[in-house]
Amino acid sequence: MSKVMTLKDAIAKYVHSGDHIALGGFTTDRKPYAAVFEILRQGITDLTGLGGAAGGDWDMLIGNGRVKAYINCYTANSGVTNVSRRFRKWFEAGKLTMEDYSQDVIYMMWHAAALGLPFLPVTLMQGSGLTDEWGISKEVRKTLDKVPDDKFKYIDNPFKPGEKVVAVPVPQVDVAIIHAQQASPDGTVRIWGGKFQDVDIAEAAKYTIVTCEEIISDEEIRRDPTKNDIPGMCVDAVVLAPYGAHPSQCYGLYDYDNPFLKVYDKVSKTQEDFDAFCKEWVFDLKDHDEYLNKLGATRLINLKVVPGLGYHIDMTKEDK
């Protein structure tokens, strides 16, 4: 059965206000921007997010007031913005409810969710501010239905009496959204390069949406199963979205759009400029096709990477 849908229909069917969502990719690598823009257009809000090594995707959701609670380790457009500006401003202003874990623990939490574990025991974070301080208090947690009542609990190691380990909760993800290079109509997905948390969140979530650069036939994708990363049984919607990770990069196909990210770094310094940017690049555009038309063919083609090198060569002096 074909799972191919339009982006508008996939978001409308599977993503709802109040959901706990997880986004694939890593800072400026294969982030599902096209899907995030559609979430913004559809007015979906009150989201709980487990961000991992997040980027401008989560920064835009936060800056538009769509995030109710945010569990995170790092949010940045690496190499351009070391700490995403709307994320930082909203947190410093007390407008963002956020919890902080170490990056290694967050990625293990995702894997534990994929395995269906009830909780995750770790030896990490002990003796650090991550256990000394809670970003979300117990009192506030009781008001958040998608956030566990405790950040962690100390438990005894049953195999080593007297040793304490940290038990962290396993996320209950409603929707995972991933951008990949290739997918087939039955939902099988191929990810080139780093996989990051993408396989885990696809397996853990109740629903998974995959936007992709290319849809290849079910027959073709089965010819070399060693290249496949996510089985079709884990995917609910497949969406054709060329350059769906822009302005981040998509390994093997196109580089990140450094001038675009620099503009975003500048405009995200103030809420007024950020809002104007979102109006121009998200809300005034009907869909992803209009976004690509606004970027223009020349700009998009110039981002294509040189085969074997992994980056594009049409770089201005400003970019070098």
From Swiss-Prot:
Pathway involvement of the protein, from the record: Amino-acid degradation; L-glutamate degradation via hydroxyglutarate pathway; crotonoyl-CoA from L-glutamate: step 3/5
Reaction equations catalysed: trans-glutaconate + acetyl-CoA = (2E)-glutaconyl-CoA + acetate
Keyword Cytoplasm among record annotations: yes
UniProt keyword list: Cytoplasm, Transferase
GO BP term, pick one: glutamate catabolic process via 2-hydroxyglutarate
EC annotation from Swiss-Prot or TrEMBL: 2.8.3.12
Cellular component, GO, one term: cytoplasm
Disulfide bonds: none
Source organism superkingdom: Bacteria
GO molecular function, one term: glutaconate CoA-transferase activity
Enzyme superclass (EC): transferase
Entry annotated with the keyword Transmembrane: no
Localization (cell): Cytoplasm
Pfam family, one: CoA_trans
Role: Catalyzes the transfer of the CoA moiety from acetyl-CoA to (R)-2-hydroxyglutarate and related compounds like glutaconate.
Subunit record text: Heterooctamer of four A and four B subunits.
Family designation: Belongs to the 3-oxoacid CoA-transferase subunit A family.
Protein name from the UniProt record: Glutaconate CoA-transferase subunit A
Gene: gctA
